Structures are given as structure tokens and as C-alpha cells.
């Protein structure tokens, strides 16, 4: 057994110690559910008859309690490009299950929002809380007691974390994530940036912008940038919840179909009546969560996962915080550059070696815990292999080779950066996260006057009026989970990018979120405590000097201490109801802080 890197070992040990009581309570829960919870043998005849009434040819199998019944929770809709392929999955999966003597039922559906559609719109204020709704819907779906295993169909931003948060309440069930894959590549990313900035400057019209956007987002599958959706897939791969190499195979291909078939066959093998029982609650543990953070840092993944990973972990009784991310970032090298951290997209990453190469390199550097349980029989080492179809059309896995393009992937011995993509900033403004992997190091330290806003639309107005044509740190506050649901502010990126290109020192500080697609412009985000909770960001005034320094790990308002301490907090803007946002008031009231995952449904749930 090779030695684990000392920092990874140290962080893992403290996560285990910090989680000792909560993890024990969780394991006790899933053991109880396995032994005494509701399952088919414990249902009444009437319960069972209702459960398989519409199943036609599968009824005999469903009456046989020695056969595995897999509950599918699907996030299908055909507005969300990544989820459109799931239209075909349930019927295909039923066929695949019958091949191994099992059955499949659609246990339920969950909503799936597209942040690309709601970006900059009122619906974005429901986006983060949709994760909690998805968790609740997943729990409802699996509550019928008809299933010995689960298959979760989800890809995008809040959907995968929500599915896992709900499924972990049924952690005694073997569970697999079944992805659909990325869309084929559209226009070059540099061209996308150029046209968006031209539009922000008023140099082209809406038709030209829409033509570009439609050429970029043009088919079924995930968006091809390395944002939150594709970071989800990386995390699932490192957690061992996919069939190895499933993450980035495009939809509608023979390999994609073969991987879906293999996923159904594999979860059917994992029931507790067999000899390879692997429940979800044992796969997600302290060590696998640390591995997920390592994967995030090594690939420059989405900042949203500084909330999603803690939220998922907490559902399994595991407690992580931003210090864990920061300490791991100091020793985990950046070995992948995928847009927005570089010019190449997720398909080019896959063709260059993809997740198999990333995991191979991280294992070789002893940066991953090896003693973890995965869906794959051989453990985490199996994820250092890439899937392929042999000449007979059979699914096989081949060891990862060398990267096909060193502008996308590099070995640990020659990384893009010696440390990871995310940094913790601290100071008299609170704690915040910073995505260093997407920002030119010359912008890692910025000291400038602030311009304070409480609404992203007002930032756009100020930009168009020329009021931001100077060195400026734009502050957008009252964007935290308890204020308005913590929307993403990605709509501001083109305007801030124009200012940066014009030679100004510019940055953004916010208690809100930014899209996983955000890059280039320095952003201190998820500032905690948030403004509504009395956070110091609520004290800032126009003209205050703020210093952001990645090297120093600082986020400071350079205001004399006596004056700073005496300042009152700004008042929260009036809430504007509409588009259903008013229905989420109970979520806003109960949301945890960003560092704890900004989860509302855990309050009072003993989680």
C-alpha cells in the first residue's frame, strides 16, 4: 500500500474526527433501514398490488422477492438539453434489467432547472433552492418501499446534488448515477466571449448575439464548458458512483448505450441479498468526500461545489468546511485546463484522456484515498481506465495512456499550476471563495475603490452609463441564501470583462454565487456571513478601498477600525414577489450559511 500524501491524510483524519458523531448517527440510521425499514416483503398485499398494477409482463418478477427491483428517479425534461436524452432511458433500462433477471420502475420525477435559461432572470432566485426541492422529491420517490436499488438520472447544476441529498436518506440502497453526456462541440469559446462582449458594448444587436448562442448551445447533452454540470460529472466519477469513464461520452452513441446497459447490470448485482452489497451510504464517506474535493481542485471545477460538496457530505453525516478545500488546494496541482480556465472544451478534454488520465495521475501522486468503496468492483483504480467498444462491440476498459494534448491535460510532475484552483479568502469582510484557476495571476491582487449595489440590474445600468470606467471593485450584496436565494450573477461577466480588457483593475465581491462558467475576472464570492445576516459586506460604502489578495488569502476593507466598527449595516432591499419566489420564503428563513452548503431542508431534520 502506497503512502497517502501527508496533507491529504491530515485533512482526511480531521474530517473523520469532526464527523465522528454525525457519521455514526447516519450509519446507525441506514443499518436500521436495512434491517427494519420498509421493503417489498414488508408491504401488504394491497400495497404490492398497487405498486405493480401497471407493470404488465414484469408482474411475476415483482412478486418474486429474490429479484432486484431498481427504482429510477429521473430529471427528464426537454427544455434542459442535458436531460433530453433521458426521455429514452427508462424503457431501455427496463430491457437491460430483464437481461439479468431484475426489474426497473420509474419511482418518480424531479424538477430540473436550467441556469442557462434563468441566468439574470427572476427565476434564478429559485435555482439554488431547487436543489432542496429535488432532494425532497427524490425522498418522496424512494419512499414507497418497492425498491432494492436505485438509479438516478441527472446531470446539471442543482440536480445531481439534490438527487444525492435525497437518495442518501435511503443510503441502505445500492445506487448508481447514470449520465447522458455532453453535446457535440459548437463554436470556439474565444468567439463566444468576443461576441458577448461586443453585445455588452452595444456594438452588435440581439440577432447576432442569438445566432452565436444558438450555434454554441445547439444539441442534446450538457453544455461543453467546464461549469457546474460537468463538474458534477467529475465529482460522481471520483466518488465512484458512475460506471468508470461514463461522465463525458456523448449521447446517442453506441458507447453511451453500452455504459447505460452496464450501469443497470451493475446496480442489479449490488443488492443486499447478493455477495457484493454496496449501499450508497457506504460509498459516500469521509474519504470519498475528500477525494471529491481533490478532483475539484485538480481540474479547476465550479465554485458552486464549495457548497454542493458540503451539502452532499452532510447528508451522509460527513462535515467538511472551506478550510479543508483551502488546505488541499495548497498541495493538489492543477492538471487540467478546460474552458473557462482555458480555451478547450469538455469534448477535447475527453479526447485528450479525460477522467481516466486525471485519476491515474492523482493516484500516482498519492493524492486520493484508495481504501474507498465504489460501484466498480476494483475500487478507485478502476476509474483510471477508459471505456471503449472492442471489435466485437463489447464494452471493455483500457488503462489511461498519456494525454493527447498538453494544453488540456498535464501530468502531476508538470502541472499548469502547482496548487489547486480554489482559494479561501478571509478578513474583516468575512470568508469567501476565489477561483484562481480561471484568473491570470497578475490580477490575483487588486486594491481599488468599491461601488456598492444590491441588485445586479443596477450594475448593468451603471456599466452602460460609463460609471464603472475606472479601477473598481464591484460589490453586489444581499444576494445570499437568506436574502434572495443566492442567485448566480454570471450575467455581469461580459460587462466586467470589457472593463478588464480596457485596462482597468476590476473585481467582484458578492455574497451571491457565480456560474461555474465564470472565468477571467477576479471574484470573491459566497462571502459569509451574508449581508442579511449581519455580515460585514453590509457595511461597505461607495469609495471604500478593498484589497483582494490571493497570495495573502485576504479580503479586507481598508477602513480605520474605529470607523468600521461603528458603522451601521445597510438595510435590506424590499422583497419583490413574483414568479413563485414568494413560495420559497420558508427556505430563505432556514437556509444555512454558504460554507455549510446553504441548505434549507436540513434545519430541524437532525442532519
Swiss-Prot record:
UniProt GO MF annotations: 4 iron, 4 sulfur cluster binding; metal ion binding; phosphogluconate dehydratase activity
Cofactor note: Binds 1 [4Fe-4S] cluster.
Residues annotated to bind [4Fe-4S] cluster: 156, 223
Reactions it catalyzes: 6-phospho-D-gluconate = 2-dehydro-3-deoxy-6-phospho-D-gluconate + H2O
Keywords on record: 4Fe-4S, Carbohydrate metabolism, Gluconate utilization, Iron, Iron-sulfur, Lyase, Metal-binding
UniProt key word Acetylation: no
Claim: Transmembrane is one of the keywords in the record: no
Entry cofactors: [4Fe-4S] cluster
UniProt-listed Enzyme Commission number(s): 4.2.1.12
Record Pfam families: ILV_EDD_C, ILVD_EDD_N
Disulfide feature: none
Swiss-Prot/TrEMBL GO biological process terms: D-gluconate metabolic process; Entner-Doudoroff pathway through 6-phosphogluconate
Its job: Catalyzes the dehydration of 6-phospho-D-gluconate to 2-dehydro-3-deoxy-6-phospho-D-gluconate.
Protein name: Phosphogluconate dehydratase
Amino acid at each position: 500500500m502506497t503512502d497517502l500524501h501527508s496533507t491529504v491524510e491530515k485533512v482526511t483524519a480531521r474530517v473523520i474526527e469532526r464527523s465522528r458523531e454525525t457519521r455514526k448517527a447516519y450509519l446507525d440510521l441506514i443499518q436500521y433501514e436495512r434491517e427494519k425499514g420498509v421493503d417489498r416483503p414488508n408491504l401488504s398485499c394491497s400495497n404490492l398490488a398497487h405498486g405493480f398494477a401497471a407493470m404488465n409482463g414484469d408482474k411475476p418478477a415483482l412478486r418474486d422477492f429474490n429479484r432486484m427491483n431498481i427504482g429510477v428517479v429521473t430529471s427528464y425534461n426537454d427544455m434542459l438539453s442535458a436531460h433530453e436524452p433521458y426521455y429514452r432511458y427508462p424503457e431501455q433500462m427496463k430491457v437491460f434489467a430483464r437481461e439479468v433477471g431484475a426489474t426497473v420502475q420509474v419511482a418518480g420525477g424531479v424538477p430540473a432547472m436550467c441556469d442557462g435559461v434563468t441566468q439574470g432572470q427572476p427565476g434564478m432566485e429559485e435555482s439554488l433552492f431547487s436543489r432542496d426541492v429535488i432532494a425532497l422529491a427524490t425522498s418522496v420517490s424512494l419512499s414507497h418501499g418497492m425498491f432494492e436499488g436505485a438509479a438516478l438520472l441527472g446531470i446539471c447544476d442543482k440536480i445531481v446534488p439534490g438527487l444525492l441529498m435525497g437518495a442518501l436518506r435511503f443510503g441502505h440502497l445500492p445506487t448508481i448515477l447514470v449520465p447522458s453526456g455532453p453535446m457535440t462541440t459548437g463554436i470556439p469559446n474565444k468567439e463566444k466571449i468576443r461576441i458577448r462582449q461586443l453585445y455588452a458594448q452595444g456594438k452588435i444587436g440581439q440577432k447576432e448575439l442569438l445566432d452565436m448562442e444558438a450555434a454554441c448551445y445547439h444539441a442534446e447533452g450538457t453544455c461543453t464548458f467546464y461549469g457546474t454540470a460537468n463538474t458534477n460529472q467529475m465529482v460522481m466519477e471520483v466518488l465512484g458512483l458512475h460506471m468508470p469513464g461514463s461522465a463525458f461520452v456523448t449521447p446517442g452513441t453506441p458507447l453511451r448505450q453500452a455504459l447505460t446497459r452496464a450501469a443497470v447490470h451493475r446496480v442489479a448485482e449490488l443488492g443486499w441479498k447478493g455477495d457484493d452489497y454496496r449501499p450508497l451510504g457506504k460509498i459516500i464517506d469521509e474519504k470519498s468526500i475528500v477525494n471529491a474535493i481533490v478532483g475539484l481542485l485538480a481540474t479547476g471545477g465550479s465554485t458552486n461545489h464549495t457548497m454542493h460538496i458540503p451539502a452532499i457530505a452532510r447528508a451522509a453525516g460527513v462535515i467538511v468546511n472551506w478550510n479543508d478545500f483551502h488546505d488541499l488546494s495548497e498541495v493538489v496541482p492543477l492538471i487540467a485546463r478546460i474552458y473557462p480556465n482555458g480555451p478547450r472544451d469538455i469534448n477535447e478534454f475527453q479526447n485528450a484522456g479525460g477522467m481516466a488520465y486525471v485519476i491515474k495521475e492523482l493516484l500516482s501522486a498519492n493524492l486520493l484515498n484508495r481504501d474507498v468503496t465504489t460501484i466498480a468492483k476494483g475500487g478507485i483504480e478502476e476509474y483510471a481506465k477508459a471505456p471503449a467498444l472492442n471489435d466485437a462491440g463489447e464494452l471493455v476498459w483500457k488503462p489511461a495512456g498519456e494525454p493527447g494534448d498538453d494544453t488540456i491535460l498535464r501530468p502531476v510532475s508538470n502541472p499548469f499550476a502547482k496548487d489547486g484552483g480554489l482559494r479561501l479568502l478571509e478578513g474583516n469582510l468575512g470568508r469567501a471563495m476565489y477561483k484562481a484557476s480561471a484568473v491570470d495571476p497578475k490580477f490575483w491582487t487588486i486594491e481599488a475603490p468599491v461601488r456598492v449595489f444590491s441588485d445586479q440590474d443596477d450594475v448593468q445600468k451603471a456599466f452602460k452609463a460609463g460609471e464603472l470606467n475606472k479601477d473598481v471593485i464591484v460589490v453586489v450584496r444581499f444576494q445570499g441564501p437568506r436574502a434572495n436565494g443566492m442567485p448566480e450573477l454570471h450575467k455581469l461577466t461580459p460587462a466586467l470583462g470589457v472593463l478588464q480588457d480596457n485596462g482597468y483593475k476590476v473585481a467582484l465581491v458578492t455574497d451571491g454565487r457565480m456560474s461555474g462558467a465564470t472565468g477571467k475576472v477576479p471574484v470573491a464570492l459566497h462571502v459569509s456571513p451574508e449581508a442579511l445576516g449581519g455580515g460585514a459586506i453590509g457595511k461597505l460604502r461607495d469609495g471604500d478601498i478593498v484589497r483582494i489578495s490571493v497570495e495573502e488569502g485576504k479580503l479586507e476593507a481598508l477602513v480605520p477600525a474605529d470607523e468600521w466598527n461603528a458603522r451601521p449595516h445597510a438595510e435590506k432591499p424590499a422583497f419583490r414577489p413574483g414568479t413563485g419566489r414568494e413560495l420559497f420564503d420558508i427556505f430563505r428563513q432556514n437556509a444555512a450559511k454558504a460554507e455549510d452548503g446553504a441548505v434549507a431542508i436540513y434545519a430541524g431534520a437532525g442532519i
